[in-house]
Amino acid sequence: MSTMIQYVLYLAILVVLAIPLGAYIKNVMSGEKTFLSKVLTPCENLIYKVTRVDREEQMTWKKYAVSVMIFSGIGLVFLFLLQLLQGVLPGNPQHLSGVKWDLAFNTSASFITNTNWQAYSGESTLSYLTQALGLTVQNFVSAATGIAVLFALIRGFIKVKSSGLGSFWVDLTRIVVHILLPLNLVISLLLVGGGVIQNLKSAETVSLVEPIAVSAEGEILEDTVIDLDTETVTVDGEIVSNAQIVTEQFVPMGPAASQVAIKQTGTNGGGYMGVNSAHPLENPNAFTNLIEMISILLIPAALCFTFGSAVKNKMQGIAIFMAMFLCLVVALGCIAVTEQVGTSQLAQNGAVNMSMAEQAGGNMEGKETRFGIAASSTWAAFTTAASNGSVNSMHDSYTPLAGMVTMLLMQLGEVIFGGVGCGLYGMLAFAILAVFIAGLMVGRTPEFLGKKIEPYEMKWSVLVCLATPIAILVGSGLAAVVPSVMDSLHNGGAHGFSEMLYAYSSCGGNNGSAFAGFNANTVFLNVSLGLVMLFARFLPIIGTLAIAGSLAGKKKIATTAGTLSTTNGMFVFLLIVVVLLIGALSFFPALALGPLAEFFGSIA
């Protein structure tokens, strides 16, 4: 019962916070005053003055798209060079060398696309300068880019016989100054208060309370007797040769809290530490876990209410929100149940039944005992529903069915809330498809929010919806026939295939999480995954802006008795069916070879 209360509490807090934030974002989008305007508007105006941006400019969809591409391209080149040259730049107290070109390209593509796929361990690969000036900055502007494209699409629904969608530069500035900076300042302070590190100290080495012994293979030896004077390790009275005695531990330092805040709210996901929010210095306790977890879906959920308010049809925003929310609840339920029950092998040895006051049992492999099944399962559902990718547990250790659900959430196109901005404009593309299908069934010209949906919008909507499946399936298909990729798999068989499919699903869905057994730091994988991320990010952006430009040029159609309602339960059901059909039809064969084969093999 207490576990169920946790799930309900997490979801309730999300909804309660999302509604007022959605109203605030709507005011920012339309340039209306907010309670922070007196402080932030002068900063915004100063940026326009310095950069000579015309705040009244109305860009066509093509100019808006070109601006997005140029801005992202500059970010890609800057971050790439910053990584290559970090060895000779300041802000590097650990004297880390420059990053290899293929990993630098992969990381640059990852962060400018809001994916934050990490084929490296942050605390041992990147300097403080690279983390702060490179990654953290991209966390802000890549998130702002996604929201800006959504703003352009919303204006497409609002405007009548117009070619202007607003200015990308104005939208970008407003989003960063009025939304992301104040929100993340508050969250950063909460995280620091909860124990997340935030400093510029060099990494420290501390003495362990008691020494441990490690075998030649790097595994910790148990039940050992360690003699520090003779430097010998014995197990059951026998000396273990080649054993190494460890008496000190490396403790990373750095500006973690500020990066953790934006990695969550911006659905970026890239951790300051290699193990992301499973690290006790990045997510030390239940309080910080709650803050970080709710932050994942806060803006994506709020944008649904922003959309409804902006198009002057709040029920439309609620309908989109309910479609996403219902899918999330079902996915969370599947993950939670399968993780609590575990596998037949765990049940046989009694592991899932070991319930104590501190631990409720279940599949605890790869999970932190300070979080348990409920917080870990909720985070897994939230982070893969959004294009976030941060983790507080290792998804590679989840049961086959739970792993499949996390994979499917990404493969659906990251539209079950999805990334900030991109999740909602992806779902709106599915909504256009749903309206078109419904129009065919009743023999009427499809329309959505008073705008006719014609072949031009349909073609671009299909492209937006299929970009993710194409990127994932083509990428993973090519990787499956490259011999060197097999060396990156920690496991063979169905689970090994799942590791590879998850990697391409994560990058194609701009998510960034991974099955930890997959070694992605090779030239082929760094380049191929980087290209998948770029394709899956910018093709939908171009398609969305093309739809926005077309809709803005149309006139409004009066609602009649024969107009399909897009705010009732029937439309919500139809929208969910369309999303699931495209996902299921596209990925069922691949899922059958991976997690489904592993599941049925485990019960055979």
Give the positions of each predicted feature.
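P-loop potassium selectivity filter motif centered on the GYG triad
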Residues: 90-135, 198-294, 347-422, 486-535, ...
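N-terminal alpha-helical transmembrane segments of multi-pass membrane transport
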Residues: 1-106, 151, 158-162, 166, ...
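Long hydrophobic segments that form regular secondary structure
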Residues: 287-318, 325-326, 387-459, 535-536
